[in-house]
């Protein structure tokens, strides 16, 4: 077979695959254009100028977005994209930050257990002493004061940078963050250790945990262009924890993402905004709608405080003291609005901060229905006194994707509806990017 015939057959095969794939994509997409609308409260006409966009993906080859108005006019429109090549969702760098634990667990073979320091030296010595006389299937344990064997909390930080279909992982050197934060475990904290030998005698299982409490955290760092921002919440540590020994003091920290190896440079870590840990009950940091500006939220004596932090100058641009909360609210960002969702009992409430003349202004307050689930991929939009809020949620009665939408104005809720798109919870179908919500532009 000559090379021209081989090339011809390859082109035919690609054409067949492409046409077949487009037919499959079209079939999948067309089956999901229909939107079922349920008006649960209020008047759907209040939502006529609202536009909702649902993005979905099937098997990394078919993408489609359906945009519709809750009122049904104009009719839903769907844009399709199909590719023979894989089109995985766009991914961003993210960081995981954990620590503050007085706990650890290991399972190791007898040889590894006796020769490798899988725990801090003093704890490893204690574990080996407990295991020394154990027969197969037996366990031994003890309690001790934390300061007798370990003095400072451990921390771990990992940065995952997207590279093609995978991620490159960068971590901090062992004990490097412990040396930076230098947070002592409170004296008098009781810790238990148990060691169990397997039935065949070949393995040891060690568990270290606090007595009468559970401490520690595992959360995301805030990754921007060149930096990872971190915070430490007193709510994640035992009562009485001392933060005064942190290098640079307690506050907002950042560490550069740039590195010549697979280790993050803890030596370049900075405390960029000093804060008083005695005033703070909880804290979180996130990106804002503007490049180079972060949102820093703190709970201080029961009141929520919002700061806008400028990365370039390391200064606070704006500072607001808001409502009272017993726990940190969920934050939903829109183009010109910041929505705070509270899960405090007995009811869920919201506060909308609208951007006016370069400032956030508390504009609307209300109560959301008590649901058994946390709001998933929420979106918010505001225009001329009307606040729209939407969230994806599993439908309890029918298969499909349920999306709930609320609209409020100064007088209260004016619309609450649910929208279903059939069969969207199939295994091969998933939301490729968050739900988008907007008001129709004037004259559009």
Model-flagged regions — what are they?
Residues 95-290:
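Long, acidic/polar, low-complexity amphipathic helices and coiled-coil-like
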Residues 225-227, 290-293, 335-338, 384-385:
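Short coil/turn segments that connect the beta-strands within blades of beta-propeller domains
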